[in-house]
Amino acid sequence: MSQSKEDKIRSILEAKNIKSNFQNKENLSEFNEKKASKRAEDLLDVYYNTLSTADMEFPYWYNREYRKSDGDIPVVRRAKALKAAFSHMTPNIIPGEKIVMQKTRHYRGSFPMPWVSESFFVAQGEQMREEAKKLASNTADELTKFGSGGGNVTESFGNVVSIAGKFGMRKEEVPVLVKMAKEWVGKSVEDLGFHYEKMMPDYDLKENLMSTLICMFDSGYTLPQGREVINYFYPLNYGLDGIIEMAKECKKAVAGNASGDGLIGMDRLYFYEAVIQVIEGLQTWILNYAKHAKYLESIETDLEAKKEYSDLVEILEHIAHKQPRTFREALQLTYTIHIASVNEDAISGMSIGRFGQILYPWYEQDIEKGLITKEEVIELLELYRIKITCIDCFASAGVNGGVLSGNTFNTLSIGGLKEDGSTGANELEELLLEASMRCRTPQPSLTMLYDEKLPEDFLMKAAECTKLGSGYPAWVNNSNGTTFMMKQFADEGMTVEEARAFALGGCLETSPGCWKQLTLNGKTYSIAGGAGQSAGSGVHFIANPKILELVLMNGKDHRMNIQVFEPHNKPLDTYEEVIEVFKDYYKQAINVLERANNIELDIWRKFDTSIINSLLKPDCLDKGQHIGNMGYRYNATLNVETCGTVTMVNSFAALKKLVYDDKAFTIEEMKDAILNNFGFKDALEVGNYSMADQVKVDKTGKYDAIYKACLDAPKYGNNDLYADNILKNYEVWLSKVCEEAQSLYAKKMYPCQISVSTHGPQGAATLATPDGRLSGTTYSDGSVSAYAGTDKNGVYALFESATIWDQAVVQNSQMNLKLHPTTIKGQQGTKKLLDLTRSYLRKGGFHIQYNVVDSETLKDAQKNPDNYRQLMVRVAGFTQYWCELGKPIQDEVIARTEYEGV
């Protein structure tokens, strides 16, 4: 925000006696020169004034061609449909843009994919049509109802229908969506998945787990791709024409030739044909933008703007065919390929990877030749940040709000090591940090792959960036990441050198990569890129406290009145018996969800085959096999995601202490207190989702003693082995149990321990818990963050608790800390923040991220969201605009312990 805008807003607020709290003024004042370029600020204003728009153009052309090519080989048929969709996308260039193209013809938005999932649109079809009919009488006043939600269209207005709680769609497009959705009934990945899932003998258990929110959502048709790292190598090294030529040559070599691979060898011919079809569609898409830029040039009267359009024409016409020549061309091509990738499927978390190292060849050579300055590079990176922030993912309201919080997790990793073990940091990565400090947008989020070999000044620069309060970079233990790579992918040939190529996919999913040798103007560079399947498509978010709830309630969900598990009918006379039943229920949940997910993903790979992401990542082009035929180098990537770990740990500690060790209460008394919410209203009734401001209704005091005892029971995060050992035992057990699960590729699975935003809705679906948490309130965030307000012994005690187990044996763990801005003010404060981070990572912690903001600012922003449009917070592995978060997550972030001294 410019100083003039800030002063104007402050004067307005002060006139109304409203406190003017801007994000982290204590720390921003240290870096008051960190302002985005005028061009970037103008485009950010466009973004802030743009609503998320759902558009039917891409699906219309996809569906039309798909029908037309009925009878063709499935992978080729899908390629032709994608080609038609890309070829017919309407170009839209915003004045001032130097990086162009987007998901749809709208600056911000996405589109539905009924071939993947259509049930929501069919079920809501009549309602949406009725909504569209009555909209003509709506007044413009209704616009203000969702103004506090940033770009989210939470309510219908004017000529616009709200869809999935986030997107607006023009009413004339609604009938097209409903008609198309009905065409896919019984044929979508979702419907076919349900059809075959029902053949499982324990299908009812799976449905019960979903209905009660023990499991958050199915991944096979909801978000089948993503939470992985893209690979830009082939377009960057060969150009799009080069890929087509490779595919044509390979087609000749494999036609009719099984080459000892059996029947799967015959699939290579069809895959290479599909690659050609899709690339041709992408080329048409790019060239359509070039034509549009040429048209804009022809009508532009300003000479400077005219030259900019001319430059765009030259860039787009070149990258549509050839290897990029300059840094700007390489940046444009990688962005274009990224959009192509996320348009192929329902995707969140298609992460960018080691971007500063990938684009370094062009940066180095352009700087040496004097073709570009550092300031020009920074501006381009600012513009890139805005374009990535514009990416939206179309999903159901439950997924968009309950998991993604509107974020798409396009994480960019910096630091780490090169193939030879030397530092991966370079000058371009420093400029990426600088651009992130000047142009503070939620996307792309940055992750520092911390290693002891990284230069001190580079780490200090990253700490300065974190201090500004954007929540990034998050800090990840590079040593832990490479150790996990070696463990999980040993059977697929992972080496130490290749393990160093990993990066973060999605918000916090450790994702395998590989090194490729790129040649630019005769000089060879080794660059990293993704080489694995989705690292987040598996069992999606088991609610740990909810499993414990059902143990106590004999397998029954009292909120929904559903008998989820078979009654165990055990008296739970001992703590060991509670643990035994918990493990049994947990294993049942993993088993049935894993098998259902395998069916969904198997149908997805057959009918919604990935072609763009397949051709990008090694070794699909070499093998002639797409993702679904394990063309990728690494395929043991599917996981079991969990939520609410610390709430569960604290609950076990309370049960053990109060019921079994001290015998202060019986198990029946505990169950009664839980069913009656310790005498309080449910959080959903109150409208507050943290433990603050809950309303007591019991006037007898019946539950006062047990409630106080539960709150006072041992809690994780205080270096107290009573609670911490419960976490340790759980983690050791969970890792083994997940390895027993098997993905559709017959590969072992592993734990993924992040909450994203699921701790909100899953907490809402859970009764009170034995730790004193009340019904409907949000779970603990992350996996090793303390439950809000329960870490009483300082941050270093929390670190001791978190590192009681070996965090390198699983995909991730998640630690969130909230620091008051004054705690890390000044240069010494920056050093203090870096030392704090080092302390945790050196102890074996995998991940740590910070919110540097005071709680009073957040409370005021909750009341006056329009005054804080630019305020961002770190949630759980991602950064998002405060005004676009749901209230349950806002309440949880406010409630987190705020450290004023470290």
UniProtKB/Swiss-Prot annotation:
* Domain Glycine radical: residue ranges: 782-902
Keywords associated with the record: Lyase, Organic radical, Phosphoprotein
PTM-bearing positions, type Glycine radical: 877
Gene3D superfamilies associated with the record: 3.20.70.20
Q: Residue span of the signal peptide, if any?
A: none
Which Gene Ontology CC terms are recorded? cytosol
Reaction(s) catalysed by this chain, per the record, are: 4-hydroxyphenylacetate + H(+) = 4-methylphenol + CO2; 3,4-dihydroxyphenylacetate + H(+) = 4-methylcatechol + CO2
Where's the active site on this chain? 507 (cysteine radical intermediate), 509 (proton donor)
Query: One Pfam family this chain carries?
Result: Gly_radical
Q: Which SUPFAM superfamilies match?
A: PFL-like glycyl radical enzymes
Q: What are the PFL domain coordinates in residue numbering? A: 38-774
Name the InterPro entries for this protein.
Gly_radical (IPR001150), GRE (IPR051215), PFL_dom (IPR004184)
Q: Carries keyword Phosphoprotein?
A: yes
What post-translational changes are documented for it? Requires the activating protein CsdA to generate the key active site glycyl radical that is involved in catalysis.
Keyword Lyase present in the record's keywords: the answer is yes
What's one GO MF term for it? 4-hydroxyphenylacetate decarboxylase activity
EC number(s) recorded for this UniProt protein: 4.1.1.83
Q: Which residues take part in binding 4-hydroxyphenylacetate? A: 348, 507, 540, 641
Q: What class of enzyme is it?
A: lyase
This chain's function reads: Glycyl radical subunit of the HPA decarboxylase that decarboxylates phenylacetates with a hydroxyl group in the p-position. Active toward 4-hydroxyphenylacetate and 3,4-dihydroxyphenylacetate, forming 4-methylphenol and 4-methylcatechol, respectively. Is likely involved in the catabolism of aromatic amino acids such as tyrosine fermentation. 4-methylphenol (p-cresol) formation provides metabolic toxicity, which allows an active suppression of other microbes and may provide growth advantages for the producers in highly competitive environments.
The entry assigns this protein to a family as follows:
Belongs to the glycyl radical enzyme (GRE) family. HPAD subfamily.
Self-association or partners: how does it assemble?
Heterooctamer consisting of 4 large (HpdB) subunits and 4 small (HpdC) subunits, arranged as a tetramer of heterodimers. Also forms a catalytically inactive homodimer.
Q: What is this protein called?
A: 4-hydroxyphenylacetate decarboxylase glycyl radical subunit
Its ancestry begins with: Bacteria, Bacillati, Bacillota, Clostridia, Peptostreptococcales
